[in-house]
Amino acid sequence: MSNLTLSQFLQQEKGNLTPELAQVIDTIAATCKTIDQALQKGALAGILGSAGNENVQGETQKKLDVISNDYLIDALKVHPHVGGLASEELDDFTPAQENGEYLVLFDPLDGSSNIDINMCVGTIFSILPAKNAITQAQDFMQAGTQQVAAGYVLYGPSTMMALTVGNGVAFFTLDPVTQTFLLTTENVQVSADTQEFAINASNQRHWEQPVKQYIEELLAGKTSVREKDFNMRWVACMVGDVHRILCRGGIFLYPYDLKDPKKAGRLRLMYEANPMSMLIEQAGGASTTGRVRILEIEPTELHQRVPVIIGSKNEVERVTSYH
């Protein structure tokens, strides 16, 4: 039996998935194919390296950050069902079509520090219902529970999409010959227990005590109260780390730290934490800041940052109990 295409899969889905939403998701997928092609060319097209400027986050932009952002903006701002866009790379939102039913938020190229060393990167997206005929900045201020779809595209040895429309999580793999996303896994589930964790251990001295205690227990392994050994994984790309968790379980932590105490966290709520939390929860996992469920946070600004602890439910609950 042949694999369903992404478009065929969307036609069969129920619940939040309207024909208009399916069209928006199809457009995102098509644009990610274009991003994938640009990544494949890499140095041959002269598009590696820095673009020579910073984004709104104060981060140095890579050329492919800018290219990927432009591809998504250009494709979605003319889409008849998109009322507005917000990108991690831009200061303000981008108005789109009057009476567009949906708002799209995205990180065009997560993990872009990996580009020049040819390691995995990804695109993350979140879709919210539009509130007004003409989109205003305040319309984006919706909790993650209001998302009607979320997903990412992982550009790795194969190019894959993870997608949820509120009815579980599915994986699609891009056929390099036909350039079609084909359904390869349905009903993705995150195991409740794990022996893998992902954290940037170089920040250990800046962590709060609950996170220090939790990681110390994992590192002590069998000699600690955990009575089993753990392995650490870190690929400097949230898409890569979350994809591993969806495939075989695990916990990912980017906690609050005192390195820059004015920042509530490092990752962006609207572009990273919310869509990834929806995916993980739809697959049976859990997501928190350590103190509150991420999807219940009421945002106050487009580029709001939060701590993120996400993955296998029992581990997330354990580290939360230490806070």
UniProtKB/Swiss-Prot annotation:
Q: What is its EC number?
A: 3.1.3.11
Sorted alphabetically, which SUPFAM superfamilies does this protein's record hold? Carbohydrate phosphatase (SSF56655)
Q: Which UniProt keywords apply?
A: Carbohydrate metabolism, Cytoplasm, Hydrolase, Magnesium, Metal-binding
* The keyword Hydrolase is annotated on this UniProt entry: yes
Gene3D superfamilies xrefs: 3.40.190.80, Fructose-1,6-Bisphosphatase, subunit A, domain 1
Cite the annotated pathway. Answer: Carbohydrate biosynthesis; gluconeogenesis
Query: Where, subcellularly, is it found?
Result: Cytoplasm
- GO biological process: one example: fructose 1,6-bisphosphate metabolic process
Note describing how the cofactor binds: Binds 2 magnesium ions per subunit.
Named cofactor requirement(s): Mg(2+)
Recorded superkingdom: Bacteria
Q: Does the keyword Magnesium apply?
A: yes
Provide the binding site for Mg(2+) 1: 88, 107, 109
The terms describing its cellular component in GO are: cytosol
An example molecular function term from Gene Ontology annotations: magnesium ion binding
User: Any stretches that span the bilayer, and where are they?
Assistant: none
Q: Describe its assembly.
A: Homotetramer.
UniProt family annotation: Belongs to the FBPase class 1 family.
From the Swiss-Prot or TrEMBL record, give the protein name: Fructose-1,6-bisphosphatase class 1
Q: Origin organism of this chain?
A: Acinetobacter baumannii (strain AYE)
